[in-house]
From Swiss-Prot:
It is found in: Cell membrane. V region of the variable domain of T cell receptor (TR) beta chain that participates in the antigen recognition. Alpha-beta T cell receptors are antigen specific receptors which are essential to the immune response and are present on the cell surface of T lymphocytes. Recognize peptide-major histocompatibility (MH) (pMH) complexes that are displayed by antigen presenting cells (APC), a prerequisite for efficient T cell adaptive immunity against pathogens. The gene is TRBV5-6. GO terms for biological process: adaptive immune response; cell surface receptor signaling pathway. This is T cell receptor beta variable 5-6.
Length: 114
């Protein structure tokens, strides 16, 4: 694998362990090169209307990216504008990262709540 490749592993924040959160993320893993764009999707647990996205770099704790509630961004962490999102009427959400950098290589997590 060349130095320009980014490995992206995606897991559910609560759905990956013993707790069944009902959150579904796709794709489950992804490899991209620097400069490309990526879109990650999250379907929340039935009845949940809030979706939060997190980035977890190797050896670090999860860092809050943003939260969507009823199709509007409610809160945003300290991430550049290259990180954007959207929530659809069915409450599913997308995380978009443009102009990928090597430092964007991380675990991306979504969580849903009421």
């Amino acid at each position: 694998m060349g130095p320009g490749l980014l490995c992206w592993a995606l897991l559910c924040l609560l759905g990956a362990g013993l707790v069944d959160a009902g959150v579904t993320q796709s794709p489950t893993h992804l490899i991209k090169t620097r400069g490309q764009q990526v879109t990650l999707r999250c379907s929340p647990k039935s009845g949940h209307d809030t979706v939060s996205w997190y980035q977890q770099a190797l050896g670090q704790g999860p860092q809050f990216i943003f939260q969507y509630y009823e199709e509007e961004e409610r809160q945003r962490g300290n991430f550049p504008d290259r990180f954007s999102g959207h929530q659809f009427p069915n409450y599913s959400s997308e995380l978009n990262v443009n102009a990928l950098l090597l430092g964007d290589s991380a675990l991306y997590l979504c969580a849903s709540s009421l």
